[in-house]
């Protein structure tokens, strides 16, 4: 992960936002203080019907058969149509070359250059090796879970069946996962 030292240059894969921004319309004047102070993690929703895929002129953004929305960074021309189309703000533009600011280059993951859009890809290079995405592994509070919601034996499915959950902006028809 590049350390630019200037927040405006950062490339975001995951970040936090106030609850009211993440789930507009779900909080109200009588929401408890805990809910109002909550800052849920935000990242690509890997939508069932991703608008970013439809608008990409080079097909650099695509949806895999397993539902993960991916990017071919070598095909990206940096037009930012995908950024404009994403209703979740889940994409970042590399305005600077990230390589000089990256302490350790991951040989399993290509480095991108200035002028390319990035997003969360669920650490597909880790998934290919059978390991969890880095954010899930690093979260000390165990607030993040990864898995196949269609698999009735998966942790994510169990959580969806036993805990309250919200889909971000479900009314848009993108089918956020």
Report each predicted region and the residues it spans.
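Non-ligating segments of multi-cofactor redox enzymes
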Residues: 1-177
